Amino acid sequence: MFAVIKTGGRQYRVVPDDVLEIGKIAGDVGTIIQLGEVLMLGGDTPVLGLPTVAGATVAAEVLQHKRGPKVISFKKRRRKNSKRKRGYRDEITVLRITEILADGKAPSIGPRPPREKKPVVETSAEADDAAA
């Protein structure tokens, strides 16, 4: 089963366990969010929404928030000694699609426990520097 969802003005075709990079949305890392604008459900019997499918949502887990690649906008006017350079980086949220839900069902998968960070082990060179 697949779904076509709309978020941030763009449309995505998703199946469970897909990983998406979309424009930044609210939600802490590890939480499950629901994307409600489902335009189409596909599978054995496809359902088209007018404009959205009633009662259908897509559950997704927030994997991380990050910044996209730098985009540079450079404009130059020849022979005028005039140029303008600007750059920006988009804020991105990385999602993993967990479930495609129809008929107003609630997601069955809860949020995953946060990852434990590995303890930092001091090397002998760092310990010698600290002792000196």
Curated annotation (Swiss-Prot):
Region: Disordered, residue numbers: 104-132
Entry similarity comment: Belongs to the bacterial ribosomal protein bL21 family.
Domain of life: Bacteria
GO terms classed as biological process: translation
Record keywords, A-Z: Ribonucleoprotein, Ribosomal protein, RNA-binding, rRNA-binding
Entry protein name: Large ribosomal subunit protein bL21
Gene Ontology MF, one: structural constituent of ribosome
Subunit structure, interactors included: Part of the 50S ribosomal subunit. Contacts protein L20.
Protein's UniProt keywords contain Ribosomal protein: yes
UniProt-listed InterPro entries: bL21-like, bL21-like_sf, Ribosomal_bL21
Described purpose of this protein according to its UniProt entry: This protein binds to 23S rRNA in the presence of protein L20.
GO cellular component, one term: cytoplasm
Record has Protein transport as a keyword: no
